[in-house]
Amino acid sequence: MPIDDCQHKFEELASEVLPAHFARLTEARKSARDARTFVGHKSATRELLSLLNLTDDFPGCYVFYDGETPVYVGISRTVVKRLSQHLNQDNHYSASLVYKMASEDYPHEMKRDQAMKDEQFRRVFFDVQERLRSMRVAYIEIDNDLEMYLFEVYAAMRLDTATWNTFRTH
């Protein structure tokens, strides 16, 4: 019985489907967008979608690049909305990557909610968010949930983004 309506066997995913998605991501890298394109849009607004030449948000995978270096691989059922959250939101729920990076720059023992109320930490948080805004982002659509989840791990390993990608569960 297929998981999440994925019609491929694991062997086919590993040998054909995921490499094909990676080839599309590699091609998308050539036309990566400035992350600043998403700044000022807290969601996938019509205005933002229009800027991106899209009519609707979409499920898929995205990669932040610092120059030529891949930094982070993410997935979402709503990629444009998720990128907007990373780059605009000021809380650890919606901007979890920014929070994680800021916690590396400003180690602390505080709970997440406490850290977000700490002025020094907030300064570091917004500095990190600004650093993320200076990057470029490439993305591809992946409609099937199982393919999308497997591809996140595949791409993170291929792109060596282990600094910020982790798959450790709670």
Write out the residue ranges for each language-model feature.
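Structure-specific nucleic-acid interaction/processing domains
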Residues: 80, 116-170
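GIY-YIG nuclease catalytic motif and its immediate N-terminal context
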Residues: 1-81, 85, 89, 146, ...
